[in-house]
Amino acid sequence: MMSEDGYNTDFPRNPLYIFFSDFRSVLKFDELGLEIARIALPAALALTADPIASLVDTAFIGQIGPVELAAVGVSIALFNQVSRIAIFPLVSITTSFVAEEDACSSQQDTVRDHKECIEIGINNPTEETIELIPEKHKDSLSDEFKTSSSIFSISKPPAKKRNIPSASSALIIGGVLGLFQAVFLISAAKPLLSFMGVKHDSPMMRPSQRYLSLRSLGAPAVLLSLAAQGVFRGFKDTTTPLFATVIGDVTNIILDPIFIFVFRLGVTGAATAHVISQYLMCGILLWKLMGQVDIFNMSTKHLQFCRFMKNGFLLLMRVIAVTFCVTLSASLAAREGSTSMAAFQVCLQVWLATSLLADGYAVAGQAILASAFAKKDYKRAAATASRVLQLGLVLGFVLAVILGAGLHFGARVFTKDDKVLHLISIGLPFVAGTQPINALAFVFDGVNFGASDFGYAAASLVMVAIVSILCLLFLSSTHGFIGLWFGLTIYMSLRAAVGFWRIGTGTGPWSFLRS
């Protein structure tokens, strides 16, 4: 039986039922559907804004020259790779911890307000005013007296700032990690670039080192911004991060041509524009956050550094496992030759870009689930997991149809080479056909994080990576290009399977499904 809130009030004993519960209501805009949409849509838009801005950024840099474009490309790849190690654990953990603390704090405030109202004789704690004039005399009062009597109404006290220790912890950790990353990349820029294949006598070395060193100055702003985004996600507010992201990206796009062409700063101007935009974005997010959270009035005993570091290490292992699988597949494609690498890169970028849309549902699921688990509202937890997984599956099928048709006719946008186009057509069935599996795998990530099941999420992904690496090595050696895509299909299928197994067996935080 469905409640008006959008979740099933009957609690089945078979955990597998959660995947099929109320599937007919998957697109219904009830209370739960609207809450998911309010979180998922801005989150997906914010996630897609940065890649679009990067494309525009790349277009401006490409006007300087091919050497500068290649140099900046290597520097950006290195910067993003180092950043990813810290970003993913920081944002994921912050979202869950803040959502849990905010839910518990709201419950405590409700109970405290209820007790205070009972003590002063108010039966309904939600009333904003106390009636001072008997009902039977209201009709005889003049309008003037009614107006003047309103001064006796009890007004609401000003809203207090939230006291969320995890928010302060995340910002401190983000700031420290950002400073460490900046020092590391600036001091080790030359050897790191050499490791990436840029030789010391290459014409790319000087512009790539200059760009990386300047870009690294923005690392503290990047990590602080993402920590703040994690806090807002925990509050189920993805609109504020979207606003800050758009402002920052637009600023970057405006400053790029000014610094690059008007001031003739070249690569230096591109890096400077990016750093300015990052600090602007960081400033907006911190300003908005300080209006809602008391981030400074926090004793050290309430900060949760140990909890952050423990779960952060688990997710770090997970990030390394995921990154290694994708990097290995690209490396194996490169060994097949430039034609295979070009086709693989086009297919891979399209394959990964579509995941950003599914990540919107993952963010929504994580925030709502973390709040529900903190309140021990297991019916809402089950309903939320069911709904976001079903929405992810529907999205996957829609993307499969769009990519199946779009990439078939639009592949020439990426290349004119007939050999590359032929290989893209071979990879197309995998890119399009795996979209439902990919979407489920990414949404399962959000579901696991929302349940604070970080240990299982890390351990299962490491096991998946080991099996997938063996499959990639074997299949690429026996079947070449198509073998790589068979291997990646196995990898994503296993990622979805371990998520399905955890909930379907009713183990870990999902044991309530069996009770």
Swiss-Prot record:
Keyword Transmembrane attached: yes
GO BP terms: citrate transport; monoatomic ion transmembrane transport; response to aluminum ion
Cytoplasmic compartment segments: 1-35, 80-168, 233-242, 288-312, 371-390, 445-453, 502-515
GO cellular component: plasma membrane; root hair
CDD domains: MATE_DinF_like
A Pfam family of this chain: MatE
Membrane topology: Multi-pass membrane protein
Signal peptide residues on this chain, from the entry's feature table: none
Disruption phenotype: No visible phenotype when grown under normal conditions. Strong reduction of aluminum-activated citrate release and small decrease in aluminum tolerance.
Induction context: Up-regulated by aluminum. The STOP1 transcription factor is required for MATE expression.
Topology feature Extracellular, residues: 57-58, 190-211, 264-266, 334-349, 412-423, 475-480
Miscellaneous remark of the record: Acts in parallel but independently of ALMT1, an aluminum-activated root malate transporter.
PANTHER family per the UniProt record, alphabetical: PROTEIN DETOXIFICATION 42 (PTHR42893:SF4), PROTEIN DETOXIFICATION 44, CHLOROPLASTIC-RELATED (PTHR42893)
Protein name: Protein DETOXIFICATION 42
